Amino acid sequence: MKNVKNDTADCKVKIIPLGGLEQIGMNMTAIEYGDSIIVMDCGLAFPSDDMLGIDLVIPDVTYLKDNYEKVKGFVITHGHEDHIGALPYVLKMVNAPVYATKLTMGLIDHKLEENNMLRSVKRKVVKHGQSINLGCFRVEFIKMNHSIEDAAALAVFTPAGIIL
């Protein structure tokens, strides 16, 4: 029997929180496996009282800029500012397709239009129960309740297993 090396044998799933931990706002998490990265949400935070002159705060996306060629897309769970507010700023640095449900995409479109970016960003509306393929990932949008309509949980199927 021949020893066959599996190209993904040394690969591990990396879950990289870029914002949203130990704070309210800036929700953004990258999931990486091999040569593929997807980004879940892209939110902003509002400045604290001691941040004079600052209008908003966005996540540090240096890792995404450094690995730009791996970023397959942004998958968005819902339309609250802490989940979509940073998109116009981040997409200027890492322009990858955006996937979201209909209402969420409508809110995103409004933000992109305000920033004169509607034509430069690829967007796709995804229905609840529908899956999309991004690099080595398959992402299923699952209907869930939240304080805003059209919210989705995301099931991320990776070569190593499912992240829910």
Q: Where are the regions a protein language model picked out?
A:
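C-terminal regulatory/interaction regions
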Residues: 1-6, 23
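Metal-dependent phosphodiesterase/nuclease catalytic metal-binding core
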Residues: 5, 30-35, 39, 151-164
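A short catalytic or substrate-binding loop motif that flags glycine-/basic-rich loops and adjacent residues
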Residues: 9, 21-25, 145-150
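Extreme N-terminal starter segment of soluble prokaryotic enzymes
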Residues: 11-14, 37
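Divalent metal-coordination and catalytic microenvironments
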Residues: 15, 31, 41, 78-79, ...
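Pre-active-site segment of Zn-dependent metallo-hydrolases
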Residues: 21-26, 33-76, 88-96, 100, ...
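N-terminal Rossmann-fold NAD(P) dinucleotide-binding loop
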Residues: 83
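Metallo-beta-lactamase
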Residues: 103-151, 158-159
